[in-house]
């Protein structure tokens, strides 16, 4: 398996293992040397292509995606630079109502900044051997990244990281009485079950839910995250199964606020909460208060903070090489 966390003897990188694994005659030597050779040949080919282009007045532009594979060598070798309890993605937009979950880990920017972002500098400097310009794919990731809990399939209960979460007092300053359990736990009433599942409502109540009080239900422990639901429906492809699975996903994200990843006493309005059934259940006056809070949070509150965060990283990285920097981004 390529999932290094499952390797019995080498799930954590140990530099002292390098020499024995690369020593002639050892069990792993032949395979290790093969990949050394592949990288050596690729380096020669890339350098030759670059020199050929430059000699003819052609500039080569490379691409640097914001993330790396969760099971890649970067994470294995230097896990302290990454937050393995989250996954990066993008908020919902007109093309993806559930947002995007890219799956790769977010960065531990505080740790990176402590050593002057050496990991990123090495990445850029290595790339400068083959390219004259580069495109940062998702440059907004240097300002803030959409951080999704690892137990999620969709991106709806993510939050921007870093960002300024709201205290209870700040939320209530908009006139909205903050009911923590009601607003942060999936709101599942009988009318919502009927609306979401239709003819499957009774089956869903019997198999996936437990009664809480009045006409309110909760997800059973074995189905209380999107990843658990995904596993339960693995291999099931009928229309009815997909209907129920996607409905259960929607229950998981039927909240008004998500708790801050770093401070349990702070909260973020759930992205596009106005489209969920928890919002529909509010009084019109509370909807107006939530909308005011939501718009301030997503379009004003964090702007200066995000700018200052980017300025801790981007200037030093841009100056790390002579390559021309191009930035790209789409969406929110």
PLM regions: where:
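Catalytic cores of glycan-processing enzymes that make or break glycosidic bonds
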Residues: 1-332
């Amino acid at each position: 398996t390529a999932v290094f966390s499952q390797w019995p003897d080498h799930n954590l990188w140990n530099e002292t293992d390098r020499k024995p694994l690369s020593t002639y005659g050892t069990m792993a030597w032949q395979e290790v040397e093969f990949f050394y050779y592949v990288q050596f040949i690729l380096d020669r080919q890339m350098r030759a292509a670059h020199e050929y282009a430059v000699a003819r007045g052609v500039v080569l532009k490379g691409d640097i995606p914001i993330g790396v594979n969760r099971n890649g060598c970067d994470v294995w070798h230097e896990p302290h630079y990454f937050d393995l309890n989250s996954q990066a993605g993008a908020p919902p937009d007109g093309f993806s109502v559930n947002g995007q979950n890219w799956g790769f880990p977010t960065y531990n920017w505080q740790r990176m900044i402590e050593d002057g972002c050496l990991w990123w500098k090495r990445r850029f400097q290595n790339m400068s051997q083959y390219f004259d310009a580069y495109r940062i794919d998702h440059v907004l990731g240097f300002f803030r990244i959409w951080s999704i809990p690892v137990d999620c399939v969709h991106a709806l209960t993510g939050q921007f990281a870093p960002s300024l979460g709201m205290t209870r007092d700040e939320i209530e300053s908009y006139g909205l009485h903050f009911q923590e359990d009601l607003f942060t736990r999936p709101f599942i009433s009988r009318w919502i079950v009927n609306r979401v599942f239709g003819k499957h409502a009774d089956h869903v109540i019997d198999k996936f839910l437990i009664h809480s009080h009045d006409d309110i239900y909760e997800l059973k422990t074995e189905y209380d995250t999107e990843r658990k639901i995904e596993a339960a429906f693995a291999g099931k492809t009928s229309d009815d199964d997909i209907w129920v699975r996607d409905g259960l996903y929607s229950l998981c994200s039927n909240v008004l606020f998500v708790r801050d990843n770093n401070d349990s006493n702070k909260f973020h309005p759930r992205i596009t909460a106005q489209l969920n059934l928890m919002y529909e259940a509010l009084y019109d006056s509370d909807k107006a208060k939530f909308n005011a809070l939501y718009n301030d949070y997503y379009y004003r509150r964090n702007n200066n903070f995000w700018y200052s965060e980017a300025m801790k990283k981007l200037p030093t990285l841009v100056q790390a090489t002579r390559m021309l920097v191009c930035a790209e981004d789409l969406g929110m």
